[in-house]
Amino acid sequence: AVYADNDEAQTLEIVLEDPATGVEAMLLYGVLPELDIITRSVYIRNQSSEKIYVNKVMSAELDFLYGDYDLLTFYGRHAMERNLQRVPVAHGSQMIGSVRGTSSHQYNPMMILAEKDTTEDHGGCYAMSFVYSGNFQGEVLKDQYNQTRMLLGVQEECFRYPLEAGETFYAPEVILSYTDQGMNRLSQNLHSCIRHHICRGKYKTEVRPVLVNSWEAAYFDFTGETLY
């Protein structure tokens, strides 16, 4: 998950309670103002005396009351990852996701909504990036009033999580970012967040040692002699 040191960030917690069932949903918003980053996650807490099941939970959701957007996603396969697909947001539902147990190279667990004239260097765009490598689901919906909704979270297919009384389900985090300076600036926002607030360890901001990739040259049958 995204972390911060000292006073780099603030967190807003909003607790929603269903008085009929005693179930609480806690919405957590983390703010990194210097990076134009907001993080969002959800906790589902069973405050009742009975066992419940969570069948669907989205970590982040945004509503756009007006605007005409394009949806940008990234698909791929072996040796051909991260291919950009840009399509108009149409009425109804457009969805990406994975049920492979991993997010995989088929679909990257992130989405961008961009204004029609947005390029690399100018224009408004919104990003959602899931800090999770398992099954996921991203969806964009446009209704009869031309309002757009953007959601990202755990894949709902085959998802059924039991919560005993007093237990809490912690949904993975989503990174949100916006800029009016084009896709390049949006990428920089996300890169800076990942580099400084997700990566850890000695080499987080230092030049890393050289890593020798022996796969194509020797596969798994390598020795000091074959590597030399």
Feature names for model-found ranges:
Residues Y161-D180:
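Short Pro-Gly-centered flexible turn/kink motifs
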Residues V42, G166, V212:
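Conserved, mostly hydrophobic/aromatic
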Residues S177-N189:
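Short, Lys/Arg- and Gly-enriched loop/turn segments at beta-strand edges
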Residues A1-L141, E157:
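Polysaccharide-binding surfaces and accessory modules of carbohydrate-active proteins
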Residues Q147-E164:
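Short acidic, Pro/Gly- and aromatic-enriched capping/linker segments at domain boundaries
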Residues N189-Y228:
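An acidic-aromatic substrate-binding cleft motif
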Residues G124, E167, R208-V210:
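A generic secondary-structure signal marking the coil-to-beta-strand transition
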